[in-house]
Amino acid sequence: EVKYDPCFGHKIDRINHVSNLGCPSLRDPRPTAPAALRIIRDLHPDSKQSQAA
């Protein structure tokens, strides 16, 4: 008997991207834009905030 898996998880191209259609519990591990901007701001010591100090 083959069990139905609502998470497809099939490879969709040759560089191993995987489809997670049907899996709302799986999140994209990439940071959101505001989080990425905070990281970039914190990594650059030449930002305007650090020059004011």
Curated annotation (Swiss-Prot):
Disulfide bonds join 7-23. It comes from the Eukaryota. Pfam families: ANP. Keywords: Calcium-activated potassium channel impairing toxin, Disulfide bond, Hypotensive agent, Ion channel impairing toxin, Potassium channel impairing toxin, Secreted, Toxin, Vasoactive, Vasodilator. GO terms for molecular function: hormone activity; potassium channel regulator activity; toxin activity. Residues 39-53 form a propeptide. Exhibits vasodilator, natriuretic and diuretic properties in animal models and human tissues. Acts by stimulating cGMP via the natriuretic peptide receptor 1 (NPR1). Is a poor agonist of the atrial natriuretic peptide receptor 2 (NPR2). Is not degraded by neutral endopeptidase (NEP/MME). Binds to atrial natriuretic peptide clearance receptor (NPR-C/NPR3), which may be responsible of the removal of DNP from the circulation. Increases calcium uptake and induces histamine release from rat peritoneal mast cells. This is Natriuretic peptide DNP-2.
